[in-house]
Amino acid sequence: MVLHPRLARLVIAVSAGLLIGYACVWASVSPISIGRSDFTSTYVGATLFREGHGSQMYDASLQTQLHSQVIAPDHVGNLPFVDAPIAAAIAAPVTLLPLDAAYRVWGIFQLLTLVAAVILAVRSARWPKDNWTVWKVATALAAVAALGSLSMLMEAQWTGVNALGLALAYRDWRAGRLGRGAVWLVLFAGVAKPHLALGLVAFALGWRDRRIVQGAVLGAIGVAAVSVAIVGTGGIAGFVHLVALSSTQFAPSAFVGMYGLIGVILGSGAPGEILWLAGAVAACVIAWLAGAAVRSDRSRLEVGLTVAALATILATPHAYVHDLVLLAPMFVWAMADARVRDAASLGQTRRATVLVLACWLTLSIAELLSLAGGPLAAVLGGPIAAGAVVPEVLIAFAVVAAVVTLRGSRKQGVLPGAPRPRRTHGADLTLTLTEPGSS
């Protein structure tokens, strides 16, 4: 039995210290900073919905007028509300509060959704039979203590909802409830950030199970129906139009996916857009192959979903540091899988556990560099764009996870997309493999 409780306690201590520091930083946010946070766009969109302007919710001039009133006496340009219509309906109750109080309540709510996602992933993951609770606690704290959580809290952003949807999907897929898992994934992605499901949807399609497709379609129909009920068809058209307009409002180098990396290298323009599109398609294809590998060998679920989660961040054109909290459930099941591997290894080492922790630490350091300001930025010679440091780390992790996923399925004797094993007519129900081209 492999335990290594000292390492787990060290992880707990460091993670707890970081979380306390995050709380202190968040508590010190000034009213001016709150008015300039991403939450103001949610507040504006939800206020328009609450006041009966659902069909005009994506009118840029109407948003700008209300935004100026909300942040007065400060004067900054409008940050457009471009989240899905359901987001405005969910956030509407907090707009009964003043902006500052609503910001605090909403930040806590999003943090709680992230904590719920992590706890659900911990409870659903496959841990060693004799694993101590200390490792589950350490994993949960480390998942929440990544720098993306601080960024999400500071901006009162939505990505905790996406993480909860991913955790629910993982729980049901682990239990064989494939259709219900797909429903959760699509429903929660459709609340505010549907673009944070690109690689995950490709993974689900690669799995090629009728129940998953039916669940995804059912979830999409539900999201579409509720969205139309909230803003009408005209509001949906306005949503699409405003999203297209706002895509050029932000510097590409600020994003953490391939769009950010290409923005750092080529800047904005058609060549960069074409190169990003090719990279996004490649990331989704790799996620699809990971789904095909899991279809052939269900034990590859954790590492295959890791590929899909990373591919999602890399493929989307609009992902900031706070969107990296989508990877928190991924870290949990990766740690659980590492504990299983270490427990089964000769001599019961902790090599896999240390490797996963090192990867998570590396990503956190990249996040820190991209968020660096003040004295740290001076030491580094100026702020570092997120697109200059984070995408490379994500690409490296995705390549390693993809190799492990595809090699794992080949070791089982089945290539991704090959026919599934069939049962013989023998009483012992021995499984035989049907290779392509065999008679």
Question: Where are the regions a protein language model picked out?
Answer:
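Alpha-helical transmembrane segments of multi-pass membrane proteins
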Residues: 147, 313, 333, 360-363
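Repeat-unit-sized solenoid/scaffold elements
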Residues: 119, 123-124, 187, 403-407
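Hydrophobic transmembrane alpha-helices
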Residues: 98, 193-196, 330
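Membrane-embedded alpha-helical segments of transport systems
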Residues: 191-195, 222-226, 362-366
